[in-house]
Swiss-Prot record:
Primary site of residence: cytoplasm
Enzyme Commission number: 2.5.1.19
Organism this protein belongs to: Shewanella sp. (strain W3-18-1)
PANTHER family from the UniProt entry: AROM/DEHYDROQUINATE SYNTHASE (PTHR21090), PENTAFUNCTIONAL AROM POLYPEPTIDE (PTHR21090:SF5)
Protein name as catalogued: 3-phosphoshikimate 1-carboxyvinyltransferase
Cross-referenced Pfam families: EPSP_synthase
A GO term for molecular function: 3-phosphoshikimate 1-carboxyvinyltransferase activity
Functional note: Catalyzes the transfer of the enolpyruvyl moiety of phosphoenolpyruvate (PEP) to the 5-hydroxyl of shikimate-3-phosphate (S3P) to produce enolpyruvyl shikimate-3-phosphate and inorganic phosphate.
Keywords: Amino-acid biosynthesis, Aromatic amino acid biosynthesis, Cytoplasm, Transferase
Active-site annotation: D314
Pathway as given in its UniProt record: Metabolic intermediate biosynthesis; chorismate biosynthesis; chorismate from D-erythrose 4-phosphate and phosphoenolpyruvate: step 6/7
């Protein structure tokens, strides 16, 4: 197994241009596919999850042209649904942002489509989405365990109507349903059961749909109305914002060991909820400066916070490791959906924080972290989870440094993360 040793870092400073958002990249690729016209996507993320989506689209007959560095994609839309005369089997790795939306989109047309993935994908729930699609007339069959991939879709189109979907597990279920609803045979009313997690991710979806000419009526996140007869029209160009979750590591670095760290590609005009991570750092005592398309973090003594972070679940992981450098006990609440991500992130985070000496209380949907008097060095397991590797890079700011196991797992969203992280040192 590959390991990366991060020696102690005294101070960080510099500027990082954040690579494109995974969430926006895969949503935009699917909408461009369903749209009429050719769309040029710029600042597209070049990572494993996006490659799985692109490979699947190519297999489904979608034509696109990628720039040499894979960050510009010119895609010819189908002007409607995806159909195939022959049976197709698509491998989607561990890319939830490809599996859930494609599962929904492939019910719209005609054909037989089988969706598979890595072993962890077979543990990531999709049942709530499939139940909703079945209610609208879709024929979806599980190949192993009910409620989980792999699955086969025998597509004949999607009816309109009223449908319920759970909101308390993953916003990706609702996102997938929203994106396909305009191409159903009738109007669709989506009723959300339970508290909707990660509302800002739904805002991203609705904003992108609007860019492609489709209107969603949002009744206070409890009901969403999509009127029949709409179609996606290419806006010609889509700029993919920098990934706000990825920005969190560099902003935390600035807060802990700044110096001054500036991230560009996200800012106050961002449509991503995870930019609110900077507000949490500010509550902890960091000096934060906002621009339209940049955020600056400067170092200052940090104190613990006790906050509901349901609205920023991915970026909240960075707070868990930043808490080791804050005075007092930090509590991160309402984060049950950490458990159904690339790994069970609540259990993984608790295990690895204890390795470095932290006192940790792991609840069903919260984590409570008290830093040790002296942080210990350790070998951090990353569970094939990109965010675990990036979060624990913060331990380079301890006097003892840290070792990261399987550092290349960052290829899911940020292949050259550790190179960029090193550029801030000195």
């Amino acid at each position: 197994m590959k390991q990366l040793r991060l020696e102690p870092v005294v101070q960080v400073r510099g500027e990082i241009n954040i690579p494109g958002s995974k969430s926006i990249s895969n949503r935009a690729l699917l909408l461009a596919t369903l749209a009429q016209g050719t769309t040029t996507l710029t600042n597209l993320l070049d990572s494993d999850d996006i490659r799985h989506m692109l490979a699947s689209l190519k297999q489904l007959g979608v034509n696109y042209r990628l720039s040499q560095n894979n960050t510009v994609c010119e895609l010819d839309g189908l002007g409607g649904v995806i159909s195939s005369a022959s049976a197709q089997e698509l491998f989607l790795g561990n890319a939830g942002t490809a599996m859930r939306p494609l599962c929904a989109a492939l019910t719209l047309g005609q054909g037989e489509f089988t969706l598979t993935g890595e072993p962890r994908m077979e543990e990531r729930p999709i049942g709530d989405l499939v139940d909703a699609l079945r209610k609208l007339g879709a024929n979806v069959v599980y190949l192993k365990n009910d409620g989980f991939p792999p699955l086969t879709i025998n597509a004949t189109g999607l009816n309109g109507g009223d449908v319920e979907i759970a909101g308390d597990l993953s916003s990706q279920f609702l996102t997938a349903l929203l994106m396909v609803a305009p191409l159903a045979k009738g109007s669709v009313n989506i009723h959300v059961k339970g508290e909707l997690v990660s509302k800002p991710y739904i805002d991203i979806t609705i904003a992108l749909m609007a860019q492609f000419g489709v209107n969603v009526i949002n009744h206070d996140y409890a009901r969403f109305e999509i009127v029949a007869g709409q179609r996606y029209i290419s806006p010609c160009k889509v700029l993919v914002e920098g990934d706000a979750s990825s920005a969190s590591y560099f902003l935390a670095a600035g807060a802990i060991k700044g110096g001054e760290v500036k991230v560009t590609g996200v800012g106050r005009l961002s449509i991503q909820g995870d930019v609110k991570f900077a507000d949490v750092l500010e509550k902890m005592g960091a000096d934060i400066e906002w621009g339209d398309d940049y955020i600056i973090a400067r170092g200052s003594p940090l104190t613990a916070v006790d906050l509901d972070m349901n609205h920023i679940p991915d970026a909240a992981m960075t707070i868990a490791t930043a808490a080791l450098f804050a005075k007092g006990t930090t509590v991160i609440r309402n984060i049950y959906n950490w458990r159904i991500k690339e790994t069970d992130r609540l259990a993984a985070m608790a295990t690895e924080l204890r390795k470095v000496g932290a006192e940790v209380e792991e609840g069903n949907d919260y984590i409570k972290i008290t830093p040790p008097a002296v942080i210990n060095t350790a070998e951090i397991d990353t569970y094939n989870d990109h965010r675990m590797a990036m979060c624990f890079s913060m331990l380079a700011f301890a006097d003892c440094g840290i070792t990261i196991n399987d550092p290349d797992c960052t290829s899911k969203t940020f292949p050259d993360y550790f190179k960029q992280f090193a550029s801030l040192q000195g």
